[in-house]
Amino acid sequence: VLDNTDLSAAERQPPLQADWKGCLADRDQPYDASSEPAGILTSRFVAAKCHVSSLAQMEPLTTDLEAIRTRAQSMTPDGYTNIAIGYTMGLATLRANSEFGSAAATGPNVKKFMIVLTDGDNTRNRWNSDAASIDARLSAACAQAKTNAADKNVTVYTIRVIEGNEALLKSCASDASKYYNVTDASGLQPVFKKILESIQKVRLTS
């Protein structure tokens, strides 16, 4: 469910129920820190005009690795950094009852994982460009995820590439061992290998 009542006239798009092809912006606070499905009007996802045309489209959950590779390769560094919206939307896609697809329901035989990767500090959200206030919204999202029944069963890995708030990203990981600091882009492949190995280990021993 999308809403656009809090955007400027130039940014507003007609309210739609599902088939939105534009961009999404932060939800009204405090829902911007939550992955919960939209309910009341102020919790709805905001249909926003895309200010950067090169942004890659979100890829639904899939087992098609080639589709994932293609989508990843289509990404280009542009625009601002808003880790909080990526964090909450990522968790939302892993919910069985979300607007984003058909994830399996949480259960003893279902393991869910999310990797948050960033190469910079928060620079802009829907309201301002104050890094400290945006960091606070990300911190709120991470804290809420660790207590929410649906989200706390998701194992979250965070990866800081060269730049970013190290303490904040570490706190957003499920635990300190799932935070990785990469000082050069060439170090990403070994990190992803470690993460894959840890996921496979969980799958084999659970």
Predicted regions: what is each one?
Residues T118, R160-I162:
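Short beta-strand/turn micro-motifs composed of small residues
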Residues I195:
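Terminal peptide-recognition signature
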